Amino acid sequence: MDAQYTPHAIESAAQTFWDKNQCFKAVEDATREKFYCLSMFPYPSGKLHMGHVRNYTIGDVVSRFQRMQGKNVLQPMGWDAFGMPAENAAIKNRVPPGAWTYDNIDAMRRQLKALGFAYDWNREFATCDVDYYRWEQWFFTKLVEKGLVYKKMSTVNWDPVDQTVLANEQVIEGRGWRSGALVERKEIPLWFLKITDYADELLADLDKVDWPEQVKTMQRNWIGKSTGVELSFAVADSSEQLEVYTTRPDTLYGVTYVAVAAGHPLARQAAQDNPALGDFLEECQQGGNSEAELATMEKKGMDTGHKAIHPLTGREVPIFVANFVLMEYGTGAVMAVPAHDQRDWEFATKYGIPIEPVIADAEGNTPDLSQGAHTEHGKLINSGEFDGLEFDAAFDAIAARLEANGQGTVKTNFRLRDWGVARQRYWGAPIPVKYGPEGQTVPLTDDELPVALPMEVEVDASGSPLKKMPAFYDLGEGWTRETDTFDTFMESSWYYARFASADNMEAMLDERADYWLPVDLYIGGIEHAILHLLYARFFHKLMRDFGLVASDEPFQRLLTQGMVIAETFYRANDDGSKDWFNPADVDVQRDDKGRPVSAILREDGQPVEMGGIEKMSKSKNNGVDPQAMIDRFGADTVRLFMMFAAPPEQSLEWSDSGVEGAHRFLKRLWKLVADHLDAGTPAALDADALNDDQKTLRRKTHETIAKASDDIGRRTTFNTAIAAVMELVNAIGRFEDTSPQGLAVTREALEACVLVLAPIVPHACHALWDALGHDTPVIDAAWPQADEAAMVKDSVELAVQVNGKLRARLDVPAAADKAAIEAQALEAENVRRHTEGKTIRKVIVVPGKLVNIVAN
């Protein structure tokens, strides 16, 4: 073999071998245990970032490890290709989104292949391929027929300049993220999927999956199952009733006002005779309508002049319009208890509304409400016949009274809302519905599918071009086609299943889906904990109920990898803005502990400020180009650093010196193998003929195999597995025995290193395995098995303490009994010196660890 480690030649040769031999093509085999490993597929931006590299390296290491366990492994890759960024790029660069997207896919595929990931590229697809989304359209028509889809008026974020609907995350401080215009709330008809029909099952089945508890908790909170009371407040001088839902009926006697949404019929009716209220309702239509935005916005309201009648006391309380109440959530009306709800307290304080406590504090006294609401449970006060009851008893008693009066009922509610799947955008899958001349709404038939998105279009900022293309929407005889497209979460909600049968042009899925699903390990960022992962679970249950899949859940195990973070450097400008400089352009002075002390921009030699360690991002200019690292060090070095620098769930701090260290390690391993091959031919290993040094190295080899097997297979702590191999490499480097048995032990140790590292640095290990004389490639090798006999020690070292202080170390036979160990410990010279003239009171032997002698 070449004595020099030349990563690019080595990696090119390995990748050529894998491609030529279709090494990663997955074929269903009912006689073998399968393992489906999937990393969340990327948006094709055109350039991989280090977050991608980390995610996909973790998946690749697990996939290759499971293959070495003898499993039939599927690891596919595709592209989450629809969405806003392509439209924005099209507007900016004046190119069709489709052309931009497919060019980016080609560029990113090259980058992924350069990293040597073991993907079955035969199954690749992009979600903008008509052969993919045609089945989504087909399935949607089936959901319409089953009554799981409906269309209703819904409030959206409307950008009056761009003339388009914005997602909540595209509204920044009440303004459109691109136009900067004040966003309006506007009602338009939208399509919804009935995810709420599955709320109970989505909640219960979280117990079936091996996911991080944090993610399960986030989903439970998002689904938000609660038990409360739905009750009615009559409107004074009217036949109207206001329906409200509360989880705190125990606070009912503390209601001092009712708040309704600006879109509530009562608010609109009141505004007809009140121009000021009309202006306020219009103001409420400005700004975003996300819960996050509502939580931070200034709370505003206006009295409607109407009164609500308290259902138990008969007292009249004012009805306000409040900007924090939305028609989309619940009934569009809330009962307000300012003494015991902080938001209600702030509103009441602002508008001079009475605040009346009805729950005692922990001491049983009237709570102090001068600084805020008292939100804890406690005994009821000022609540008539219900005084003195604790929460549970009060809940039941007040609910029973309301039910008896016909004014309320106990109800289970969910925070979860049905999924709005329509977007007024161009770059998405067209919704397969048509509208008739007499107002008919009809799903398209199978022979009208697919509805292909026109690809050669000019996109500008004035909204979807589909609305301006009669060739697309005009079906003749008064029939028109829907011009909305699907939310891109639709495509990512079932892609994992399509990988099982991606080549089937006749069906959405086939029996191969039942072989591969569920996904055994799904890997991605925790930022997808709610929407994507919840929608995918819902979609899976829909597919199950249509007989398309057999399992209840899509992803059996979930691994949420941490961020890749790096140092940041900037200079502040006079206007308060900052210019950020890439770490590659900055020289950093560090103290003796490696901490940064000062930094200078190389270009001008002037100092820059250190902004601390942050997630790699364009905005902070602290990203590292993976391709530049591959070009400089090779893919294996990048992969090794990614796996060694931190456990997968934790943030990984980028370190140039760490990358250089990973590269040095690979060069060292390469040289050890080359030197070993130059040293001669080893004998067949004879475990019974080994001397102590040979046994020691062999023991280290098998301890390393045992540790790495557990670290990778069970704990997924790849960094500790790599650390164990590094220790073994150090031991091999110190072992200079070139006798036939010495070479045999060295050969076994080196082969163990290569096998354990093969999932992590596959290119180098492909070459090293071949150099070590194997006919079959390392990709087809089995994971090494630890030899229990080799790990048995002939002797063990024990610490000997006298009265708790270390006085000696003993080498004793591993099989020695307590009496023999005790005798040997008492004979040790330094022990005798410290026990001379004293009475031995007790000798405690902790097998394998220490001897403690008590003497006085």
UniProtKB/Swiss-Prot annotation:
Cystine pairs: none
GO cellular component entries: cytosol
UniProt-annotated location(s): Cytoplasm
Motif position, 'KMSKS' region: 615-619
A Gene Ontology BP annotation from the UniProt entry: leucyl-tRNA aminoacylation
Primary location recorded for the protein, binned into one broad class: cytoplasm
Chain positions of motif 'HIGH' region: 42-52
Keyword Metal-binding: no
Keyword flag Magnesium: no
Binding-site positions, ATP: 618
One matching Pfam family: Anticodon_1
GO molecular function: aminoacyl-tRNA deacylase activity; ATP binding; leucine-tRNA ligase activity
InterPro entries given in the database record: aa-tRNA-synth_I_CS, aa-tRNA-synth_Ia, Leu-tRNA-ligase, Leu_tRNA-synth_edit, M/V/L/I-tRNA-synth_anticd-bd, Methionyl/Leucyl_tRNA_Synth, Rossmann-like_a/b/a_fold, tRNAsynth_Ia_anticodon-bd
Catalytic activity: tRNA(Leu) + L-leucine + ATP = L-leucyl-tRNA(Leu) + AMP + diphosphate
Key words of the record: Aminoacyl-tRNA synthetase, ATP-binding, Cytoplasm, Ligase, Nucleotide-binding, Protein biosynthesis
EC number: 6.1.1.4
Similarity field: Belongs to the class-I aminoacyl-tRNA synthetase family.
Annotated protein name in UniProt: Leucine--tRNA ligase
Species for this entry: Chromohalobacter salexigens (strain ATCC BAA-138 / DSM 3043 / CIP 106854 / NCIMB 13768 / 1H11)
Designated gene of the protein: leuS
